[in-house]
A protein has these predicted regions:
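Charged helix-capping and loop-helix junction motifs
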Residues: 20-24, 103
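Structural alpha-helical scaffold elements that stabilize or flank donor/cofactor-binding regions
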Residues: 3, 25, 75-76
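Rossmann-like NAD(P)-binding element
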Residues: 1-20, 28-37
Length: 125
């Protein structure tokens, strides 16, 4: 990440990813980096990112996820170097159609072939 102009985060929220966008990670980034987080708000230490935005270490931030959702307030709202949108990245018509199709295919695969795909509780089925 020392050479990247833009770093995007697309990971699950869990104990190992909580707070992964923090002052230590930012210190390893290129000066003027731009960060995109459309994964989960819990990845961010907001105070660390805000300080980096204020100092110019981070040139810009784009996000649609927040520590507290729905976000009525955020330290990032109103900052000129931040693009903040509601958490709607997966709410397009196309995304919803794809999710419905995938769910139907996975149910069909299980019923017809006994194949379990993406089952979090597969051992209980």
């Amino acid at each position: 990440c020392r050479r990247a102009d833009i770093i995007t985060y697309h990971v699950n929220a869990n104990d190992s990813t909580k707070g992964m966008i923090n002052k230590d990670a930012i210190a390893k980034m290129k000066d003027g980096v731009r960060i995109v987080n459309c994964a989960r708000g819990s990845l961010m230490i907001e105070a660390d990112i805000k300080a980096a935005l204020d100092s110019g270490k981070v040139a810009g931030l784009a996000l649609d996820v927040y520590t507290n959702e729905p976000a009525k307030e955020s330290v990032f709202f109103g900052m000129p170097n931040v693009v903040a949108t509601p958490h709607i990245a997966a709410s397009t018509a196309e995304a919803q159609i794809n999710v419905a199709r995938q769910a139907a295919e996975q149910v069909s695969d299980y019923l017809l072939k006994g194949v379990k795909t993406n089952a979090r509780n597969g051992d209980k089925i």
